[in-house]
């Protein structure tokens, strides 16, 4: 009789452990599916650059800056390997080490870009406040003034919330025309990314 009780208790414990394992595994898989994948690209030259890509829960691609023109190939490969489409592209500011890859990819590839968020001053402001960047600024504005690009540009405001699948981007800072020292860097868009 005691042996039957012990066997019954062992069976109940085994069933409970199995249930806990199944539920735990299911919760782990559910949490795991909420992950995003963030890629920080390395420079392909000896020069500095900044480029990130985020792959959301449903496989949407979000790019932040992208790097130099010379870095475009690695970013293009990443985007192509992940479906060939950028849902949202954030350009923080028009320095070539941030926006150069965007200039190349938006002009010379079949990659589809749906939305482009940037907070940009007019061209004369950049030319006045950082004349040493004239060539870069001229090239950048030549690209963004093309109809196929201009129609996709959205200028966010501070505290705007942009939802892309399971991520939320909050705009913390935008252009600052009153700051003319290190003007382009100090007029960068600042974005906070949160995973939901």
Predicted regions span which residues?
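N-terminal Sec-pathway targeting helices
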Residues: 3-18
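Short Gly/charged-rich anion-binding patches and loops
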Residues: 74, 100, 139-142, 157
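Conserved glycine-bearing catalytic or ligand-binding loops at nucleotide- and phosphate-handling centers
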Residues: 133-151, 155
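Short, flexible/disordered intra-domain loops and linkers
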Residues: 124-135
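Alpha-helical transmembrane signal-anchor helices
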Residues: 14, 18-28
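Core dinuclear metal-dependent hydrolase active-site scaffold
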Residues: 24-84, 149-196
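Active-site metal-binding motif and surrounding structural segment of the metallo-beta-lactamase
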Residues: 57-62, 69-122
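Intrinsically disordered, low-complexity coil segments
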Residues: 41-50, 107-112, 127-129, 146-148
């Amino acid at each position: 009789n005691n042996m039957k009780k012990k066997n019954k208790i062992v069976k109940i414990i085994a069933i409970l452990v199995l249930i806990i394992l199944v539920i735990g595994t299911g919760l782990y898989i559910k949490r795991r599916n909420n992950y995003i994948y963030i890629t920080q690209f390395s420079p392909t030259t000896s020069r500095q650059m900044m480029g990130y890509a985020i792959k959301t829960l449903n496989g949407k691609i979000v790019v932040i800056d992208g790097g130099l023109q010379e870095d475009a190939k690695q970013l293009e490969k990443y985007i192509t390997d992940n479906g060939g489409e950028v849902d949202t592209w954030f350009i923080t500011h028009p320095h070539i080490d941030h926006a150069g890859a965007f200039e190349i990819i938006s002009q010379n590839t079949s990659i589809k870009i749906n939305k482009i968020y940037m907070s940009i001053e007019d061209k004369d402001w950049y030319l006045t406040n950082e004349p040493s960047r004239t060539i870069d600024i001229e090239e950048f504005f030549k690209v963004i003034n093309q109809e196929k690009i201009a129609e996709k540009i959205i200028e966010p405001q501070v505290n705007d919330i942009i939802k892309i699948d399971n991520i939320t981007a909050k705009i913390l800072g935008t252009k600052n025309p009153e700051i003319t020292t290190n003007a382009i860097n100090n007029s960068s868009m600042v974005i906070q990314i949160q995973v939901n």
